[in-house]
Structures are given as structure tokens and as C-alpha cells.
């Protein structure tokens, strides 16, 4: 398959360059492959200057194929937890602006870790998720990406994890935000079970909230959730392929989110190299995810539509490391520090690959920093829907020019998490941060600690330069504060000081 796809990519590129001026292809297909909790190095594709031990451990041949066909983004970012990333994807808004700053599930309710917190009273964030109406409390009113694409003639398919709105709210069902087809998406952000023999959790009446819906025909079968989703995707793709309609496939896998479970198709090799139990399960889930990617790529190739299809691969946050894993906690994303839930690089830097047969570039790697907010305007540019109207003001900046090797200004990237995740570990808490160029500034709300890192020299964030480079620290504190104020960002209330947490530029170091 790898040889076929590489040859096809060369041929497709040649044909495109020879006919691009005629603009024969007006509406490319879009496949957005979103993985849950996949770490930056949880793949045999390296996104760093050096190969790591994790690149040598995991087996992701189809990611390798996609990377060889397309372009790797080595400085790609999401938010530290899942729902904020997914809302940013659907709206083009930064989490500080859309205020779905933590993961959603229960309606009209903050997260358990936020209730009765000893230090903070957390803001009344948008825990009910996305809304297409402006009258629903604690939601972000926005025009969703799939609705725009549908309105522009796209057949829209959602498969897998949705996690866009609380239980009972319209956005918990992808059909209500512009998808024509919804395969197994609902309010919950994880499955009760990945196993068909467990009916994907539908046997457990106590935890029905997590049970995966809509896959009844696979109940009782020895099939992993990822395989069932892949089979459903292949079936649903036939309609737009046969009718030659442009399509948007949002394949949003539940993998590799906990609960960690073995995919028996891929488990033996990891047992044979001496991994511990949970790591065997995790590695098999990584390979299971990759196999699903390969299934889709092969189908697009076999049906002769890959030549008119843009494929984007992304993870919704950094790799899990604080819980559920064996080995040293907060070390599963080395050389990055910490993991999911953290503002350190292990919690927010993620693997990203873009394959587009329509952009003239010989580069295989892009180091320009991009963030999940950027996907909305990029996909609209890919699909020539730039002029579409939407109600929200977006933060994202299209990364499409980068695929043409054009110079793009390095805008600041912002993170804002005025919430509490639950697990403890380095960089996990309540915080705001900004990256501008090689510099990253972090402001922890609970401790009032500030940190500055030069990521080009210190990717592991071991050397805090806050006292060495006060001028750069103050500059970034000002940039961060100006942005947070401009979007009316929420801040926690400190019960100890009886006051709202100060803005970053109000830190004593700068005053």
C-alpha cells in the first residue's frame, strides 16, 4: 500500500501542477482524522529533530504513509483537555473566547473537581457546550463548521467521539450542528467499553451515560470499537463517492482515550517485547487508530478520489500520563514535559499531518506554530468557503499559505484554563499562557507563579528564564493580558484573598 500511495501522490502532484491554472477542481473532499489523547510521540512518525524511544515503540505505518505523502507540522497545538479543542475546531474561536474551557457532559453543572474547591470559586463557564441558538444558557452561540460546509454543498459525515455539548442539549447530537450522518457520536467523551462483546458499554445500566450509541449491529461480536467505526465509515462514504458529491468526513476516534483496552488484532507484538499490562493495551490502541487511518486512505485510493481529497490528522490534546498508565507518571511524552491536563508542552503539543494534492510545496515539514483555532479558517479556505457568513468572530489564522511555502506572520498562540481538571502533576491546575515565536510564558492562577521558556533551546521546559529575561517576560505578560481582556476572559475567584485572580501583567515582578 505504501508504494501505491507514494506513486499515486507523485502522479497526482504532477497532474495538479499541470492543470491547476484551469481550476478544474472546485470543491475538494476533506477528511479530518481527529484522535483522542494521542501524544506528540505516540507514533513511529517523529515530530522532533531526534527519534525518541516512543517512536521506536509504537507502530503506525499509515501515519508514516500520510507523512510521506504530505507535510508534518512539528509545532502544532491543541488545548490541554478535549472539549475546548473540539469547540475551537468547530468555531475557529480560542477557548478564552468561547468559554467552553473544560470538558462537557452533565448539563448546567461544573466539573466535580471544580465544586467546593479549597482555593477557588471557578467561573460559570459554558459547560453546556456549543449552540446554534443565542438563547441557551452557558453555551457558545456560533455557526458550526459542518453547517457551513453543508450549506456549501458538502455531504457531511461524523464518526466517533462528538463531545460538543452536555446531555440533553442539541449539540450533543452532531446532526444538529450540520452533519448529515452521525455514527456513534453523543455527549460523552469516552466509551464505557471498546468491546463489541460488551455491547460497547450498553449492558451496564449504572454507567449508561458512557455507552456508545448506534452500533447495535455489532453488539455481541468480537470486534473493537475502532474497527466497527471504520466499517461504518466505509459504508457511509459510498453515497457521496458514487454521486461524486464533495464530502467532509470528520473521523473522530474514541481511541486512545481511557479505559485502556486491548485490540486483539494488534496486541501480540507488544506482549512479546515485555511491556506491562496497561502499556500493552495502550500500544494496541495506538496501532488500532493507525489501522483505521489506513482503511480510509485505501478506500479513497481504490475509489479514485484521493486525488481530490485533503487529509488532515490531529490530536485533541497531549498524551495521557497522569493516570491509567504504567511507568513513571508525567513522563510518557518525553522529551515534552507532563501530559494531558497540563499547560506544559506534553499537555498541548500534538502530532499533525496535512496531505493536500493542491498545494505547490516540496517541503515535508513545517515548524511554524499553529493551533486548533486555525483549523476552521483553513478548512474554509481549502473548500473555497471563505466568504461564508458566520455569527462568531474567529481567532484562527489559516495555515493554507504555509502549504504553498509562503511566509506567514507568527501570531501569538493563547491558552486559558480557569478551571480544575482533577489529577495532579507538573503544570496541571488553573492557568493562562502565550507562545510567541520561540518564547512561552505561563501564568499559574493558584500559586501566582510565572514561568518563561525558550522552546527552541529548551523543549522540555526545564530552565525557567523568568528572572533572567524580565523584559521578555513583561512583554509576553502584557500580550497575554491584552488578549484575555479583549475577549472578556473569565478568571477564577480566590477564596483566600477574597478577590478575582489578578491579570498576568499585575504580577509583582512587573510592578
Model-derived regions, located:
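C-terminal cap/loop subdomain of S1 sulfatases and analogous C-terminal strand-loop tails that border
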Residues: 181, 319-345, 360-364, 368, ...
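Formylglycine-dependent
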Residues: 105-155, 162-245, 253-262, 283
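Long, internal low-complexity/basic segments
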Residues: 23-28, 35, 40, 72, ...
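Histidine-centered active-site microenvironments of extracellular/periplasmic hydrolases
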Residues: 170-178, 259-262, 298-359, 371
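A short beta-strand-to-alpha-helix junction
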Residues: 54-60, 74-81, 107, 113, ...
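A short aromatic-rich beta-strand->coil structural motif
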Residues: 30, 36, 161, 233, ...
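A long, amphipathic alpha-helix that forms part
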Residues: 224, 228-241, 268-309, 326
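Active-site segment of extracytoplasmic enzymes that catalyze sulfate/phosphate-ester chemistry
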Residues: 32-33, 40-143, 148, 202-203, ...
